[in-house]
């Protein structure tokens, strides 16, 4: 049941990620963030003694992740406009931005893994890391299954 919920959530987010205004993106991210918290709490078990610390850090993490998410959505929108006629220069510029966004996301996850481990313990931090990577990978898969390769006809 959890996999079905996650799949539906990812599909909903992916479908709505294209060609939206910043206001719509922010609204979607807030809705997704609330639903995502339910998924995270289904897998991360901080226990009563660490719940408040975990939730505070997770909320802080989500705010920063959502800012990075806006960049990823903008990059997907750019790709949607250019994929069928993308030049080498456009591909290089786009990939530079994609790789930069991925690196920033990875740094953010590592940073919050360390913060959560310090505030709770290594098990809770590992659970956070695992569920976060699972969700991000699932979203990435859903997106890439639905977009064509550069120059594909």
Regions from the PLM with identified roles:
Residues 20-24:
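Charged, compositionally biased N-terminal leader segments and the immediate start
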Residues 4-19:
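Sec-dependent N-terminal signal peptides
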Residues 15-17, 62-65, 102, 136-139:
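A short hydrophobic/aromatic micro-motif that marks alpha-helical segments and, especially, helix-coil
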Residues 25-27, 31-37, 43, 106-153:
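Amphipathic, charged alpha-helical segments and their helix-to-coil junctions
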Residues 4, 37-38:
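Short hydrophobic "helix-edge" motifs at membrane interfaces and signal-peptide entry regions
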Residues 39-119:
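Amphipathic alpha-helical segments
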């Amino acid at each position: 049941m959890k996999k079905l919920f996650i799949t539906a959530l990812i599909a909903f987010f992916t479908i709505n990620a294209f060609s939206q205004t910043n206001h719509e993106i922010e609204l979607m991210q807030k809705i997704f963030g609330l639903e995502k918290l339910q998924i995270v709490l289904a897998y991360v078990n901080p226990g009563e003694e660490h719940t408040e610390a975990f939730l505070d850090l997770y909320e802080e993490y989500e705010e920063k992740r959502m800012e990075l998410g806006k960049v990823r959505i903008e990059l997907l929108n750019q790709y949607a406009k250019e994929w069928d006629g993308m030049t080498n220069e456009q591909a290089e510029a786009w990939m530079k931005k994609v790789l930069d966004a991925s690196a920033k996301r990875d740094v953010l996850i590592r940073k919050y893994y360390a913060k959560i481990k310090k505030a709770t313990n290594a098990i809770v931090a590992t659970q956070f890391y695992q569920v976060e990577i699972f969700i991000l990978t699932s979203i990435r898969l859903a997106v890439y299954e639905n977009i064509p390769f550069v120059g594909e006809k």
